Amino acid sequence: MAAAEDQNPASLQPLRHSPRLRPRNGYGVYVYPNSFFRYEGEWKGGKKHGHGKLLFKDGSYYEGEFVNGEITGEGYQHWAWSGNTYSGQFVLGEPQGHGIMKYKAGGHYEGELSQGLREGQGFLEDQDGQVYQGSFHDNKRHGRGQMVFKNGDKYEGDWVRDQRQGHGVLFCADGSTYKGQWHNDVFSGLGSLVHCSGVTYCGMFINGHPAAQAKKIVVLGPELLEVVQGSPFTLSVQLQQDDGEVAKSESGRVLKISAGVRYVQLPEYSEVSFFKMDDAHMETPIQTPFGFQCIPYPLSVSTSWGLEPGSTVESARADLLLSKKDSEPVLDSEAFHGKGDTLSILPARRHEPCCSAAYQRVDQGCAEFVDIHLGAPPPGMQPYLFLPSMLEKAGNRPKGDRSPPEVLSTAQEPLRGTNRSDGTTAEPSTAAYLGEYVLMVCDVTSPPFLGHRLPTTFKHLRILARGDIHLPHVPEDHPEALS
């Protein structure tokens, strides 16, 4: 009879037991002496065993399996103080095994745990939507794993205590890729970077930066390059580090060559260059490191010319009319090609001013602009030469007379089609006039490599008469010689 009563369902009701008395078997409710814990569920031999719910006074609770008084097996736990929840396997009161942890701040973790910490393989999504899948240790990303960041970047490789360290590959959202060594979450050690602009760097990295990165553009050759009028010439360029070593680890930067003519308004400097600009075509002069300003001048690149490149005068003459400054200013590349000058808009045809050959990609720190020459002055740019006799008149003008001195158009070549004595027409000149010019090589890599472009470099150029390295001289007593 007593055995039958033990099987009566009514005997399993919690009302038969006082909350202050620990139940022995079956279902019961028990409030612990410190009143912080309350248990509702199955008992066996005076211990929580089977399915039950343990409630905490702060609002936290666990519901699931118990074994011999301990939270062990499958269950669900809610922490009131953090708002986090866990559903999965437990061992001795701690999440252990496989489970899902959801965070109140956002995100969740699904995978293996040990003593409540992420341990082993798992999948973690944080509150920003960033996703990591791989190995964990001591609650941190550790070992092999891959992560997709909120900006779209993706990393696959080694981790050490939540930081990328070891060997890994980073696929950037902009198309750039880095493959190599990492330390403390940045590029460090041997690696290769393929930038979205087409620039590549293969070599050592230190604290996230290339150790042998190019810092400046250098044009090889004499300080003053002298070229015979109408002759093509070649310009060799190097990208150099701060110590002057060639940046051989770097390739792919896009360099653009452009030209300027010396801008002179004073009569005493007219022999080096003087161009009178129409108001409609006047451009803002650009300061050069040679002590004078220049204005943009057309430059052409071609592969077919009659003269040999050997006509370039290799020896540089000293004693320039204006002293050369030691400092080299940084020129914004936008000054010559405007905003939005990207590779996609480069012309494909050659033998034209500003053609695609005026753009060269660097290969292992070096580039060459082959068969380049200066063309004829553009419309609105008229070359003039002051005569010595006129300089005397200019010096004898009344004080305060600000009117420009008399000038004559130069007779180096016809400016436009003119009639010869035999009735034929002389074609306009296709070569630059004698005088001083400036070549400029600028970095137009787009987008800029690692957010920066190299400063523009300048090369001093002098155009000389064919067969004579001296500029024409007009005696004072024969002003009509050039008329």
UniProtKB/Swiss-Prot annotation:
Pfam families noted in UniProt: MORN (PF02493)
Domain of life where this protein originates: Eukaryota
Annotated spans, Disordered: 392-427
MORN repeats: 39-61, 62-84, 86-108, 109-131, 132-154, 155-177, 178-200
Record's keyword annotation contains Cytoplasm: no
Feature: compositional bias, Basic and acidic residues: 394-404
Modified-residue entries (Phosphoserine), positions: 18, 403
InterPro entries membership: MORN (IPR003409)
UniProt feature, compositional bias: Polar residues: 418-427
PANTHER family associated with the record: MORN REPEAT-CONTAINING PROTEIN 1, PHOSPHATIDYLINOSITOL-4-PHOSPHATE 5-KINASE RELATED
Protein name, per record: MORN repeat-containing protein 1
Species annotation: Rattus norvegicus
Gene from which the chain derives: Morn1
